């Protein structure tokens, strides 16, 4: 199916892809994004592992309804989670750039 040169080239591409994947995974782990809700009144910052790093609440909200504040914190976290997922997907897609993958092949992420 593959000649020696073709198989060697395929193995080289696989090794390069593995190295790039490891690098991208490190970059993802170090990423931080901030999600917002309530027009920026609540901000939640998470890292690439979806661990919460910071929660910022505008002081004006501390006088309001507790349930509303809880909803805003949850919405800000969900916004941050969506943003980090999109950033991770974009980073991981860069791993396959330049690789000659079969048509229709999808990366497992």
UniProtKB/Swiss-Prot annotation:
Q: Which domain of life is it from?
A: Bacteria
Q: Name one GO cellular component term.
A: cytosol
Cell location: Cytoplasm, Nucleoid
Q: Does the keyword RNA-binding apply?
A: no
- Main location, first listed in the record: cytoplasm
Q: Does the keyword DNA-binding apply?
A: yes
Keywords attached to this Swiss-Prot or TrEMBL record, sorted alphabetically, are: Cytoplasm, DNA-binding
Q: Which GO terms describe its molecular function?
A: DNA binding
Q: How does it assemble?
A: Homodimer.
* Annotated function: Binds to DNA and alters its conformation. May be involved in regulation of gene expression, nucleoid organization and DNA protection.
Q: Which NCBIfam families match?
A: DNA_YbaB_EbfC (TIGR00103)
Per the record, the similarity remark reads: Belongs to the YbaB/EbfC family.
Tell me what this protein is called: Nucleoid-associated protein ETA_24730
